[in-house]
Design a protein with these regions (language model features):
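Short, solvent-exposed loop/turn segments at conserved positions within beta-propeller repeat blades
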Residues: 7-12, 71-74
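Non-cytosolic beta-sandwich-type ligand-binding/adhesion modules
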Residues: 11-19, 168, 172, 176-186
Length: 186
């Protein structure tokens, strides 16, 4: 595996070289990149590594672009990974922003790790007790990791409310915590 260049961009990737010998020569895998995520809440999926879990399933851990406090600021993404019938390694990053099912055994098809739970809050009405400058409540439902809401004070009693505009079955809640005004690391 290799981390492709492009850290300065919002989208970058990981690829694979293959060989029959540990010291090479190496050739470019038939399909690359093996990990790439150009859109959605999280973008990037590069400069990572792959591991095998206790059941024999493969997972790719990769960095995802944030770049708000510093140009190389990142978060970590986790994507199911497999090898096709020709031995070509690939990762499924399509629903990397959504909850995955934790395998309780060997997974035959990595698409089966997708929970099917879809985003209910996108673009829905939001109300809040207050806001800090331009960090409006609507940022909470815009499906961007790079925007966020902040209450004016951060004191007890601040709140945020999202209307799902009807009765919905909620299977999970995802909170993206951002270190707004954090000073412990300059």
């Amino acid at each position: 595996q290799y981390g492709a260049p492009g850290t300065e961009f919002k989208v970058y990737a990981d690829g694979v070289y293959v060989s029959d010998k540990p010291m090479g020569p190496f050739t470019y895998q038939k399909h690359n990149p093996m990990s790439y995520k150009p859109g959605g809440f999280v973008q990037g999926a590069g400069h990572g590594g792959t591991f095998e879990d206790a059941y024999g399933n493969y997972w790719h851990v990769a960095t995802c672009m944030l770049s708000l406090k510093y140009k190389f600021e990142r978060r970590i993404g986790l994507y199911p990974t497999a090898f096709d019938k020709d031995g070509v390694m690939y990762s499924n990053t399509a629903f990397g922003d959504y909850p995955l099912l934790t395998p309780k055994g060997k997974v035959d098809d990595i698409a089966n790790t997708f929970s099917g739970w879809m985003l209910l809050s996108y673009g829905k009405p939001v109300m809040a007790s207050s806001m800090d400058s331009t960090l409006v409540p609507e940022n909470v439902t815009d499906e961007s990791m790079r925007t966020f809401w902040s209450a004016r004070s951060g004191e007890p009693g601040e709140w945020l409310q999202i209307s799902l505009e009807g009765l919905k079955e909620v299977r999970a809640i995802q909170l993206n915590y951002y270190e707004h005004r954090a000073v412990q690391h300059n």
